């Protein structure tokens, strides 16, 4: 892995913002004939989604369409004006590693549905954006091939299986491939019987894993507190896209109470309908250390391949930097809960 320095990271981001490639769109299922918007003309992630929609069949696009943003709309900023923001610093520390920005490519399965190269392109795009990619155990490419494409850190996400030894073996393969952290998903819909995900089983996996161990799918302060008691090092506040439970709170709504329950004793991450840099800033203010980006990464992948992934992540990095400057927060440590006001429904 190439060592991350601030100069290298800023240089990479600057190259991204200055780039203006004119891409000739490959016509895929569902794409009408005509001009595909060049990446340099894109203004926000919703425009990337529009290109992806043109390139995918209706059935495939429906799996990554939309997102519930109502919770974000109920939050507003309380900026500080008399602050020097000439030098913005997005870097953050997570599990002993310095990240250029607190924005990661989240785990998503079977990415060849969206682009012929699938996770290989996502790995290259994430590396070009100087960020971590979290690889799903349900990837369409072997973890070893994905790792060969990655120039920045990989994490690994795994689902419970009936055979706990099979889960342990998957984790060992990921560690051997160079993954820096492992994330066990709990509470997601499963097509088959799954292992008994009580604390005893989780503890068996955690104690046999030499890299940081996270739980993804925690949505209550009580379970977050229990996770800390049981030695979990990181928690991803997530409703798995709210695909299986009507009436479930948005992850961003649960974040403040979960942050209070954890009390800084585990690293909090979050996903769930993040589409703008301001969304990321709100999550950081409410207690998250980093944000996982899911569907928009797949929009970029479907629209432009690896370059589209880089565009999506780089766009969010740039928007976060701009929002930090406008809010009077020159670095990540300066972001706290006083920045955000949550309005009653």
Label every model-predicted segment:
Residues 165-270, 281, 286-288, 295:
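Alpha/beta enzyme core
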